[in-house]
């Protein structure tokens, strides 16, 4: 879904007022997006977004909840963990895309309370992870759920995630490889993503590249730089790879760039 066009004259006061009113659904939708886009974390915005997360008035033709989706996305960007229980509740929404946005938001907030509810969504394994009849999506937003568990370092979920390496959706496979590398440090999962970069489908190469960047798996740097994809996306993936590597180094006494960090930066320079 594309982002709304940005109105440069829009203000925080307008966003709060538009989100709090209930007459104009499109104004509320834009306000929720704007608050998340600019990370306008204020008590008033958080309170209004929590109300929007349970909105019943803005319904799409297929029965979805567009405002709830934007509210969940915004709450994940504001960094206030008091909203975690509300986002966990949103994992039970009938709208697949609200559940997906809630899982992504919980990943962004990094709160361990989300681990068990997210793991519960993997119950049933591959047998349950099928397409919903008449819909373009699976029973659950497995990519978002698995990626969140990896980011949250939910080591208890390893056994639940492993079967998804065999899922029929390559993107779910990549999410599983990404999370399992984050949870185990086993290089074979990083190597699976490197192999995926050699695929014939551009969209899948892009997905594998972003997942590889999120792992911080250093052997993936050269593979990302050489992948057949847009340089702009390669730069994002390499930036994420570098940031993850540096975060792991943060506990070391040396503040100097490691040889691996220098190599990643040189690869980024070569793509500019």
Swiss-Prot record:
Keywords attached to this entry: Antenna complex, Lyase, Phycobilisome
Domain of life: Bacteria
GO molecular function: lyase activity; oxidoreductase activity
Metal-binding recorded as keyword: no
InterPro entries to which the protein is assigned, alphabetical: ARM-like, ARM-type_fold, PBS_lyase_HEAT
Signal sequence residues: none
GO CC, alphabetical: phycobilisome
EC number: 4.-.-.-
Homology family: Belongs to the CpcE/RpcE/PecE family.
Subunit structure, as described in the record: CpcE and CpcF associate to form a lyase.
Chain's role: Required for the chromophorylation of the CpcA gene product.
Official protein name in the record: Phycocyanobilin lyase subunit alpha
Natural source organism: Synechocystis sp. (strain ATCC 27184 / PCC 6803 / Kazusa)
């Amino acid at each position: 879904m594309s982002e709304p066009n940005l109105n440069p004259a829009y203000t925080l006061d307008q966003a709060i007022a538009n989100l709090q009113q209930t007459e104009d659904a499109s104004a509320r939708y834009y306000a929720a997006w704007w608050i998340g886009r600019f990370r306008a974390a204020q008590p008033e915005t958080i309170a209004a977004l929590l109300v929007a997360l349970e909105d019943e008035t803005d319904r799409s033709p297929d029965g979805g909840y567009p405002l709830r989706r934007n509210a969940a996305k915004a709450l994940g960007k504001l960094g206030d963990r008091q909203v975690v229980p509300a986002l966990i509740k949103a994992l039970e929404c009938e709208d697949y895309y609200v559940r997906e946005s809630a899982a992504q938001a919980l990943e962004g907030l990094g709160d361990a309370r989300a681990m068990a509810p997210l793991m519960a969504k993997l119950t049933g394994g591959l047998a349950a992870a099928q397409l919903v009849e008449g819909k373009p999506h699976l029973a659950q937003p497995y990519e978002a759920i698995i990626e969140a568990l990896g980011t949250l370092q939910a080591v208890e979920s390893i056994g639940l995630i492993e079967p998804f390496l065999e899922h029929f959706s390559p993107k779910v496979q990549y999410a599983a490889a990404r999370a399992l590398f984050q949870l185990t440090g086993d290089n074979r999962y990083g190597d699976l993503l490197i192999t995926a970069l050699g695929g014939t489908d551009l969209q899948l190469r892009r997905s594998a590249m972003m997942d590889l960047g999120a792992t911080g798996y250093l052997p993936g740097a050269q593979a990302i730089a050489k992948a057949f994809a847009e340089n702009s996306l390669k730069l994002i993936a390499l930036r994420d790879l570098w940031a993850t590597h540096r975060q792991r180094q943060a506990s070391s006494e040396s503040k100097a760039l490691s040889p691996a960090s220098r190599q990643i930066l040189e690869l980024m320079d070569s793509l500019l």
